[in-house]
Amino acid sequence: MQIRQSVKFKKPLIHYITNPISINDCANMILAVGAKPIMAEHPLEVSEITSISESLGINLGNITDNKMKSMLISGKISYEKKIPQVIDLVGVGCSKLRLDYAKKFILECHPNVIKGNMSEMKAIYGIKSSAKGIDVGACDIITEQNFDENIEMIKRLSMETGSVVAATGVVDIISNGTYTYIISNGCEMLSMITGTGCMLTGIIASYISSGNILEGTALAIVLMGICGELSQHVKGTGSFRNELIDNIFSISDDIIIKKIRINSY
């Protein structure tokens, strides 16, 4: 929990290039964990913005030519200046443009964290996936039958890229190739409002600013899962969204420790 308190105390500046669908919620989620968001995306300014930031988030949702240029510029600056960065592989399972771009970004920018659902992870690893748009395909969902093989794939992807790999879903798998965590927190309603994955990437970017990449990533995923569970009593998805942000802001370390469901593998 030291990472949480450090972020709240230091209020790191997080540069997050994301999509217009979820940008407001992403900025508010970064604020909720105690960091400061800046969502600049113009190709002529992102180099300067990334350089003064303490972490970088890259989200491939709703990409445009300009954003593709900006993301690559920021990613390279982040790598050169050793600023922690996370890429969210939104849609690489259903779009060749995004898949090819993601491979180029990973090769040239060396992100500290690669995040996505299992369909996106299979696509980036070169395995046929069954993505349903930006959502995980039914055949790619982690089950008891494919649990071990999916963990091995995530570990291999981490070792090949040198990145912490975070595969999110009903069960979350986070690995740096040596240490692997399995997280079972969360609820169905997290998949019923748009942008929760994008919001999570903002939290990951905030927490890896501490330099603790594996632990910061795992903590962000645990936090989102537990706060989803705490928020699901509400009337519907609109109030769930608001309750989720409130719980991210107000949850205590004691509740996280009490409700966390995490195992090493």
UniProtKB/Swiss-Prot annotation:
Coiled coil: none annotated. The keyword Kinase applies. CDD domains: THZ_kinase. Keywords: ATP-binding, Kinase, Magnesium, Metal-binding, Nucleotide-binding, Thiamine biosynthesis, Transferase. Pathway: Cofactor biosynthesis; thiamine diphosphate biosynthesis; 4-methyl-5-(2-phosphoethyl)-thiazole from 5-(2-hydroxyethyl)-4-methylthiazole: step 1/1. The keyword Repressor does not apply. It catalyses: 5-(2-hydroxyethyl)-4-methylthiazole + ATP = 4-methyl-5-(2-phosphooxyethyl)-thiazole + ADP + H(+). ATP binds at residues 115, 168. One of its GO terms (biological process) is thiamine diphosphate biosynthetic process. SUPFAM superfamilies: Ribokinase-like (SSF53613). Substrate binds at residues 39, 195. Gene3D superfamilies: 3.40.1190.20. Its EC number is 2.7.1.50. It comes from the Bacteria. Its cofactor is Mg(2+). GO terms for molecular function: ATP binding; hydroxyethylthiazole kinase activity; magnesium ion binding. Belongs to the Thz kinase family. Catalyzes the phosphorylation of the hydroxyl group of 4-methyl-5-beta-hydroxyethylthiazole (THZ). This is Hydroxyethylthiazole kinase 2. It comes from Clostridium botulinum (strain Kyoto / Type A2).
